[in-house]
Amino acid sequence: MSNGKITQVIGPVIDVEFEAGELPEIYYALKVSNPSLGDEPWNLVAEVAQHLGENTVRAIAMDSTDGLVRGQEVLNTGRQISVPVGRGTLGRILNVIGEPVDEQGPVETDTTWEIHRPTPEFVDQSTKVEAFETGIKVVDLLAPYARGGKIGLFGGAGVGKTVLIMELIHNIAKKHGGFSVFAGVGERTREGNDLWNEMKESNVLDKTALVYGQMNEPPGARARVALSALTVAEYFRDQENQDVLLFVDNIFRFTQAGSEVSALLGRIPSAVGYQPTLSTEMGELQERITTTKNGSITSVQAIYVPADDLTDPAPATTFAHLDATTVLSRQIAELGIYPAVDPLDSSSRILDPQVLGEEHYQVARDVQYVLQRYKDLQDIIAILGMDELSEEDKQTVSRARKIQRFLSQPFHVAEIFTGTPGKYVELSETIRGFKEIVEGKHDSVPEQAFYMAGGIDEVLENAAKMAS
C-alpha cells in the first residue's frame, strides 16, 4: 500500500493525493504526523469520507489539524478506525480512536473491532417485550422503558438531562449489575469528569466503559465517538451474551457534528442548515442498537432540543427510532419539581395492559387523567380563582397537585448538592402510592408532605412530622 501526500487542509477536513490505483476505501483510517499534537509519529487519524477524482480523497480529521502542511506524507492503514473491545475496556475512558485518556496505562484487550459494522440480520433480532425497572417513579409509572428498547430524554438547556442519565446509571448498576457503556458526545468536559468521579465513588466504574468526544474536540471526533461506544457495547452483546446499557449524552451533538463537516464536504444543506444525509446517518447508528437472540442493548439517549422546539429536524428525526420518550419540561423545573419529567408529554410504546398488567396500566391512565383535568382547569383558576370550581373539580385539583409533588424524587447523584439522601422506589411501591392518591385515601394529607419523598409511607411520615 503506497502512502499519499496532503494537497489541501480546510479546517478539520484534509485532501490527500495517492498514486493511481492505490486509493483507500471510504471509511478507511489514514494517519499523519502532526507536530502540534506531540512528538510521536502518525499521531493524527483521519477517516476517508469522499473520493474526489484525480486520485484524491477527502478525509475528516479526528483531532486538531493545526500544524499540518501541504506535501506531508499520509499513511493508509488499510482498515477502518478500530477500537479495543472486551472486559479490558471496563473502568476506562477511551477517545474516538480507542486510545485511553485516563492516564491509567494501555487498555488490556486482545481484540479490536472496526467502528462501522453491519446491522444485525432480521432473523437474529428478538421481538420479546418486557419492562425495565429504573427506580424513578415518574418513569416507571407513566413512560416505562422496554428492555432492549431505545429511550429518548428530551429537554432544552439546563433542565436536568445529564443528572437523570447519571441517576439511571447509578440505579441500574446497583440493582441490575450489568455492563454499561457511556458515550459522551460533544458535552461539557467538566460533566465528563464529574461522571467519572461520581462512578468511582459509588463503585460502579468497574462495570462501565466510558467513551468521550467532548465539546472542545473537532467535529470528526464528535461525529464518530457514538459509533466507537456502540462497537464496545455490541461486543458485550454479541460475544458475551450480555444485556448492555448504552447511554448517549448527547445524540443531538452527533447530528450537529455531522452538519459541521457536511458543508466542508461540499454537500448542499437541507432544512434549517442540517446535512442532507441526516436521516441516513441517524438510521445507521440507531439500527445497530437492538436486541438479538444473544443479548440486548438498551439505550438511553439525551436529546438536546434547540430553542425548546421539538419540530427541529434533529430531534424530529430521532423521534422515529424511539420506543419511549421522557420529555423534560422547563415549566415543571420552574416549580422546583425534579426530575422535571412532563407526565403528559412523555410516552412509551409498552404502556399497555398486555405488557405491564391491568393494575399498572389503569393507575397510570388514572394519574394522567387527573393531571390532564388539572391542566384544563388552569385557565379557569387563573381568571376566576379556585372558589368558582365545583366541589368535584376542587378535589381533582387537590389530588393533581399531590400527584405532581409525589412525582418528584430525591436522586442519589444529586445528594451532594441537595443534602437529601437519594431514593430508589420499587415499581410495586410506586403503583401502590399513586393508586392510593387517585382513590382519595390521602385527601387529608397536606400536599407539601408529598414533595421530594420516596414511597407513600415516607409521605405519611413527613405529614406526621409536619403535624407535630
From Swiss-Prot:
Catalytic reaction list: ATP + H2O + 4 H(+)(in) = ADP + phosphate + 5 H(+)(out)
SMART domains for this protein: AAA (SM00382)
Signal peptide span: none
Main localization of the protein described in the UniProt heading: membrane
Subcellular location: Cell inner membrane
A cellular component term, taken from the record's GO annotations: plasma membrane
Keyword Ion transport: yes
Pfam families named in the record: ATP-synt_ab, ATP-synt_ab_N, ATP-synt_VA_C
GO-annotated molecular function: ATP binding; ATP hydrolysis activity; proton-transporting ATP synthase activity, rotational mechanism
Coiled coil: none
Chain positions recorded as ATP binding sites: G155, G156, A157, G158, V159, G160, K161, T162
Function (record text): Produces ATP from ADP in the presence of a proton gradient across the membrane. The catalytic sites are hosted primarily by the beta subunits.
Self-association and partners: F-type ATPases have 2 components, CF(1) - the catalytic core - and CF(0) - the membrane proton channel. CF(1) has five subunits: alpha(3), beta(3), gamma(1), delta(1), epsilon(1). CF(0) has three main subunits: a(1), b(2) and c(9-12). The alpha and beta chains form an alternating ring which encloses part of the gamma chain. CF(1) is attached to CF(0) by a central stalk formed by the gamma and epsilon chains, while a peripheral stalk is formed by the delta and b chains.
Protein name, UniProt field: ATP synthase subunit beta 1
Gene that this sequence comes from: atpD1
